[in-house]
Structure formats: C-alpha cells, structure tokens
Amino acid sequence: MTKQSTYENKTLDKKRDFTLEEKLLFEHALPKFAEYNKLMAYYRCAIMEIETKFNVLNEEFSLRYDRNPINSIQTRLKSHESIREKMQRKGLPLKLDLIEENLMDIAGVRVICAFPDDVYMLEEALLKQDDITLIKRKDYIANPKENGYRSLHLIVAVQIFLAHEKRIMNVEIQLRTIAMDSWASLEHQLRYKKDVEFTEAMANELLYCAKLSAELDAKMDALQAQEKIDSFDLK
C-alpha cells in the first residue's frame, strides 16, 4: 500500500528547496521543471485561500454562536514522489497539463470540528461562496468505509488572484470531528507501522473502535442540541 501524504497541523510551510535527487528525477521525466515548480506554488496559494475562508467562517460563527466550531486546520501539499507514483498508477506520463487535470488532491486542507453538525454547517457556508465550485463530494460520515473510516470529502475549485492573472485551482477538503480524526490517525499509524504485520484481528478491533467513535459523536451532537434548547428556554 502506498503511504498517504501527511497533513501538517499548522499554517502551510514555506517553500522548500528540491533535493538533488528530486531535481534529477523530475528534470528527466518533466522537461518543464521550472513550470512544475510554479504549478506547486499555485496549489500553495489555493491552500492559503481555503484555509483563510475557514478561519473567517470560524471567526463569524464564534460571534454568532459564542463558540468556535473549528478545533484545528491542517494543510498538505502532495509530495513530488507521491505525484509521480500516482501518475504512474494511472498510466499517465508526467506532464503538467495531465497532472493538473487528473490529480484532484495535490492540495489538501483538513478541518477538525467539535461536533458532526459543525461539519455540515461549515460545508454549507463554504459552498455558498461565489468563488467556490463543488466538483466532487463523498460523505463517509453518512456512509462509512468498510474499515470504519468516517469523514466528509470535498473536491472544490477555488479562484486565486495573482499579480497579472486569475487561476482556478482544485483543492481536496476533509471535514471531520475530533473523534473521527483520532481514529483515523491511530488507524494510519497501526496500518503502516514498520516491522509490524497488520492483521485481520487488528482490523476488526479498529472497526469496533470506529463504531464506538460514531456513538460518541452522536451523543455529543445530542448534548449540543440539548444545550441549544436549554439556552433558548433561558432567554
């Protein structure tokens, strides 16, 4: 299995220099290496746009509901090696136009929320914005994966405004609760841990934990709903 790219629990890192190995690899497979570097910069800008939008929504909802629906925001730019491997799996040559056209998850933003209802509230608010276009939606909260994974996945197109042009870039967004994120993080560590075989028994135990996590989220949503009712009654 191919190890997933890592999300960083912080604002997007500054641009790093390519290693000599990366330069040789991509200069051999991708003649327009400087153009590739520019494309990655565009994706970084798209990540910043989406991250800013969620920060603004978080600020607005904190004023409206007296709490922050977003616990944290993580960002990820797919590594050069991951891009090359994914293009190979698709049977496609390493060309800029094909990379941009066929890989929808080069730029990634993960939003961790307190409650399941927050996930859908943030989704609705984001998709109402004029410069956001929904391309693809997969609701693994309503329909979890077989292994128990839960999260809401969106692929959106966002406009970025440069000095002399406007571009539309694709960004993958994952929205999930703290419980969903904890489970996914632990599952990933166990599944890809070096020198340890991932057994069927471990998979079954993780599936059981995923069900407990879903029950926890449901109870937290119920408590949140009751708190809203109680607050309304006091007014």
What would you call each of these model-derived segments?
Residues 24, 30, 50-52, 83-89, ...:
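Short linear motifs at secondary-structure transitions and domain/linker junctions
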Residues 13-17, 38-39, 48-49, 72-79, ...:
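Generic detector of short, locally flexible boundary/turn motifs and exposed helical patches
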Residues 101-110:
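Glycine-rich, often proline-containing surface loops adjacent to acidic residues and nearby aromatics
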Residues 32-83, 88, 92-97, 105:
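Active-site acidic/histidine clusters and adjacent loop/turn architecture
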Residues 2-47, 51-60, 169-235:
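An acidic, glycine-/histidine-flanked metal-binding catalytic module
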Residues 100, 113-220:
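Long beta-strand-rich cores associated with HINT superfamily self-processing modules
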Residues 21, 28, 35, 68, ...:
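Sparse, context-dependent recognition of short Cys/His-centered cofactor- or disulfide-binding micro-motifs
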Residues 90, 106, 116-119, 157-158, ...:
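Surface-exposed peri-terminal alpha-helical interaction modules
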